Amino acid sequence: MSDEVEAGFVRVRLDLSYDGSEFSGWAKQAGGRRTVQGEIEDALRTVTRSRETYELTVAGRTDAGVHARGQVAHVDLPREVWAEHHVKLLKRLAGRLPRDVRVWALREAPSGFNARFSAVWRRYAYRVTDNPGGVDPLLRGHVLWHDWPLDVDAMNAAARGLLGEHDFAAYCKKREGATTIRTLQELSLVRGEDGIVTATVRADAFCHNMVRSLIGALLFVGDGHRGPEWPAKVLAAGVRDSAVHVVRPHGLTLEEVGYPADELLAARNKEARNKRSLPGAGCC
């Protein structure tokens, strides 16, 4: 599948963040629902005085209610539009976009760059507190309250059994034709001085609901309802377990997206498009 930029166009990388509380996710939807993609595309069309809407491609298609601090997207703009507007485009977008979404940087992307397929990892953070009094009101839109005491050491022990390349079908919402094979590079939890437990989750990519399902399983371990070996057993079974809850979205933030060196972007782009299969697993 080719990803060549059309002649006469320039590919532009956008670095952005948003509070997902009032959005129905990243991706545009029918029925006029408010989405991050829709807001940015509308703003781009307005500030460049274009008749056409230029479609964004994003690194991580976040669900409704999920936040992003380090999201990355790209858009292909006509070269004359970019030449005319690039100097003042960032400031004009700041004046046009709603306050819950910001574009922090705009620059011409290097050859071979694709915000989605060139990425080598995405890093999310999920924040939860077991404070008996609940969540700080100033943080309530970004931290989950769990009303059982959490054993972070037990949660980390459970997390270690999930690392590596696996078929995460047991932790993903099934989508027709989509692979559930992923490489979980990091899954660790730390309790801060404020009592908030932050889970760091990093992988080459994530399937639908994967992060929130993993956190749901670890919370069951942390509060003593299951042993540290349970999440790995669920993974090995390969089917959804009714005891694994998909935790609420507001505790989840996309923190950062990683890319290789410029000279490796095109190769990574091509590699990521190849559907994965585990060694020994049946194909198709």
UniProtKB/Swiss-Prot annotation:
It comes from the Bacteria. The active site is at D63 (nucleophile). It is an enzyme of class 5 (isomerase). The keyword tRNA processing applies. Its EC number is 5.4.99.12. It catalyses: uridine(38/39/40) in tRNA = pseudouridine(38/39/40) in tRNA. Formation of pseudouridine at positions 38, 39 and 40 in the anticodon stem and loop of transfer RNAs. This is tRNA pseudouridine synthase A. The lineage of its organism: Bacteria, Bacillati, Actinomycetota, Actinomycetes, Kitasatosporales.
